[in-house]
């Protein structure tokens, strides 16, 4: 893995500095997706992978959520847990138990199979949230639901072959925050980290990222790694957004954060 030994500021480190226990629960092996290296680098004290539960196969969402609930119920509060599911990572496989969604009038089986996969995830996620409510954890938690990448673009729904950045929406949902907003403008994944720092009361943490908190800054555009962009290109933030990928790459390849302290400013 390249740059796995680098120093990285992260939400996990920021919350550990505030006394949180931090744990990462993944459905695959620790060696997959470099979780064994990235978990401690991003501030996670404990990593649970499928072998932690005696499994040889990748954990389904239902099993992963059940095992995660068991762990969370016995973890000392406050804690920060990341739970990494996989069912919608490549959701093109035909479902073993199709629902009425499979009768959707389209020639694209990829579209139907993807809808089925997200339907299954929604059901399992809903069941997990109900379980958190039943054991009393839900009311004491801020819950972030975030996608790391898109899968089937909206262009498929429209019958368009070419996929643009506008077709590549990903989920970002926050539950139980002090704020109530529905963000209608364009924003990017680069804005997730500073938004989570903000909602968790970590605004004095030494590194706030290259994006902006959506609760404080009117973000109206996003820029992809290939230079394509979406939204208001006249935004005063746009120029910095176009530079962020190059800045990030230089920071990673040069181990920019090595030897730096990321304590809270008031300290």
Feature names for model-found ranges:
Residues 1-267:
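Solvent-exposed soluble domains appended to multi-pass membrane proteins
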């Amino acid at each position: 893995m390249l740059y796995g030994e680098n120093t990285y500021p992260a939400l996990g480190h920021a919350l550990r500095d505030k006394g949180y226990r931090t744990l990462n629960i993944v459905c695959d092996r620790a060696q997959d997706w470099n979780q064994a290296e990235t978990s401690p680098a991003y501030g996670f004290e404990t990593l649970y992978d499928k072998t932690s539960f005696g499994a040889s196969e990748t954990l389904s969402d239902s099993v992963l959520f059940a095992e995660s609930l068991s762990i969370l119920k016995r973890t000392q509060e406050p804690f920060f847990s990341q739970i990494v599911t996989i069912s919608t990572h490549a959701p093109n496989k035909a479902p073993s138990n199709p629902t009425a969604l499979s009768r959707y009038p389209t020639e694209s089986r990829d579209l139907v199979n993807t809808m089925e996969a997200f339907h299954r995830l929604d059901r399992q996620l809903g069941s997990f949230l109900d379980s958190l409510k039943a054991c009393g954890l839900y009311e004491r938690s801020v819950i972030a639901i975030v996608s790391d990448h898109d899968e089937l673009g909206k262009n498929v729904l429209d019958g368009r072959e070419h996929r643009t950045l506008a077709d590549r929406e990903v989920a970002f949902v926050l539950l139980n925050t002090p704020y109530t907003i529905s963000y209608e403008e364009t924003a990017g994944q680069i804005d997730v980290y500073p938004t989570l720092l903000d909602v968790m009361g970590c605004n004095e943490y030494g590194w706030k990222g290259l994006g902006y908190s959506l609760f404080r800054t009117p973000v109206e555009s996003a820029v992809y790694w290939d230079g394509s962009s979406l939204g208001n290109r006249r935004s005063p933030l746009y120029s910095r957004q176009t530079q962020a990928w190059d800045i990030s790459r230089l920071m990673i390849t040069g181990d920019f954060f090595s030897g730096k302290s990321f304590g809270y400013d008031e300290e």
